[in-house]
Amino acid sequence: FRKADVGIKDGKFALIAEPGCLPEAERTIDAGGKYVLPGGIDTHVHYRDPGHWERETFEVGTRAAAAGGCTTFFEHPISMPPQWNGEIFLHLCICKGEESAANDRHEKGSCVDFCFFGAAGGEHPEAIEPLSHEGIIAYKTFLHEAPEGRDAEFEGLTSANNDQLYR
């Protein structure tokens, strides 16, 4: 750790400099004696939204992430339904920048940056590759059957045997 001045432009870190080397600013915050750290990235979250709002909603989960210093998260599929095809992904978990009711809800509900994993199980292998063009960053596959009574949460997400896995 070292002492430094931090320049912010448009809400983002723009420059880290030796103390006293930054130009005059509109606003100055004295953070002397404090640590300034980059935001954390949580690469594995399941918000269960939609489908199990009683467990955690997108809005509540992202606020908790921000409170803990996390500025980016990667959402993994286990919602109802999980994002195993482009239609579900675009309807439920659409990437930033697209216009839709789902995107508005997620954009307005999140106070941190986010991206999504897609489901890549053995039930719908034809949907895996096209999903990559919709904006997901990676795939998730469970190598077991859906737990009893939870088939809807795991649709398109499991490859419980080698036949499914190697298709």
Predicted feature residues:
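Histidine-rich, glycine-flanked metal-binding segment
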Residues: 1-38
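Short, low-complexity, polar/charged sequence segments that are solvent-exposed and flexible
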Residues: 8-13, 48, 59-62, 92-94, ...
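Receiver (REC) domain switch-region micro-motif
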Residues: 28, 41, 139
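Metal-associated gating/positioning segment near the N- to mid-region
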Residues: 31-109
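Histidine/acidic-residue-rich, glycine-tolerant segments that coordinate divalent metal ions
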Residues: 79-87, 95-167
